[in-house]
């Protein structure tokens, strides 16, 4: 690829990554389709996708930096505003409980999970994840037991972590799994989304660093500009996407996202079959 072409491809994929990483629509499904259409596939493409995820993670850190530092007892000025009706407070224990199930499952079945990265499995994951979103909207308690993120219990955090295991299935969507699990456990749509974003930082950071380490042999200095463009675009777009998403879910349900997932699944079928 020419330099200009490779930078353009990097910018497009950075936008796709940033736009879809934290929405319940599966960034994996979108990256597979767009990467295929752009002719950007193989080991370098896989490493590129892993690296630009760091841009999306950085966007969450920037958005929730005060809350993240507060979880480890570091406060700059006033503590983050209390979000809830009770007197509880989200703690690092909630995050750890939300991480444990997927970390354990991911370590045990790492090689099996990697073997699932193909269009067929992604297509089915998109469909099943869409059904789960609809089920969460239909079956969730009429009155959430955790209105704000600080109302969440340890049990709710752990069960959300169990739902996160579904995201080990490529194409399922980590945010879709965790948000659906939270809503079914009586966490409000907004609080479940916030917790999903906070949970993403250690989960994605750990997985990304591990993948980068294992892919280091496919990196070379000539790829740095392309990777940098993808990283920056993913960061900027993810920042905008997160802000917009949190405002949007105050007004609409996740049904439109579920329908969109079915459309993407159909697109995967058309493109690859």
From Swiss-Prot:
Membrane topology, as annotated: Multi-pass membrane protein
Compartments in which it is found: Cell inner membrane
GO CC term, one of those recorded: plasma membrane
Principal subcellular localisation of the protein: membrane
Catalytic reaction list: di-trans,octa-cis-undecaprenyl diphosphate + H2O = di-trans,octa-cis-undecaprenyl phosphate + phosphate + H(+)
Annotated keywords: Antibiotic resistance, Cell inner membrane, Cell membrane, Cell shape, Cell wall biogenesis/degradation, Hydrolase, Membrane, Peptidoglycan synthesis, Transmembrane, Transmembrane helix
InterPro entries on file: UppP
EC supergroup of this enzyme: hydrolase
An MF annotation (GO) of this entry: undecaprenyl-diphosphatase activity
Family: Belongs to the UppP family.
PANTHER family with a match to the protein in the record: UNDECAPRENYL-DIPHOSPHATASE
Protein name according to UniProt: Undecaprenyl-diphosphatase
Organism: Klebsiella pneumoniae subsp. pneumoniae (strain ATCC 700721 / MGH 78578)
Record gene name: uppP
């Amino acid at each position: 690829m020419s330099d200009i072409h490779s930078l353009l491809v990097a910018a497009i994929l950075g936008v796709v990554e940033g736009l879809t990483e934290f929405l319940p629509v599966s960034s994996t499904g979108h990256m597979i389709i767009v990467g295929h259409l752009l002719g950007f596939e193989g080991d370098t493409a896989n490493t590129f996708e892993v690296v630009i995820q760091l841009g999306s993670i950085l966007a969450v850190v920037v958005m929730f930096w005060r809350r993240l530092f507060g979880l480890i007892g570091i406060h700059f000025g006033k503590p983050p505003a209390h979000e809830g009706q009770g007197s509880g407070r989200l703690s690092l224990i909630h995050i750890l409980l939300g991480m444990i199930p997927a970390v354990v499952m991911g370590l045990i079945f790492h090689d099996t999970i990697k073997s699932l990265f193909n269009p067929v499995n992604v297509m089915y994951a998109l469909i099943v994840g869409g059904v789960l979103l609809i089920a969460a909207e239909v079956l969730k308690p009429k009155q959430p037991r955790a209105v704000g993120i600080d109302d969440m219990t340890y049990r709710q955090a752990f069960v959300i972590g169990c739902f996160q295991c579904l995201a080990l299935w490529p194409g399922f969507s980590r945010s879709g799994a965790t948000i659906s699990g939270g809503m079914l456990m009586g966490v409000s749509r907004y609080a479940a989304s916030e917790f999903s974003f906070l949970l993403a930082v250690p989960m994605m950071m750990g997985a990304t660093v591990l993948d980068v380490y294992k892919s280091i042999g496919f990196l070379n200095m000539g790829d740095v500009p392309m990777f940098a463009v993808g990283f920056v675009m993913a960061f900027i777009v993810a920042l905008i996407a997160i802000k917009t998403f949190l405002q949007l879910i105050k007004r609409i349900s996740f049904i439109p996202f579920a329908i969109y997932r079915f459309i993407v699944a159909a697109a995967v079928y058309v493109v690859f079959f």
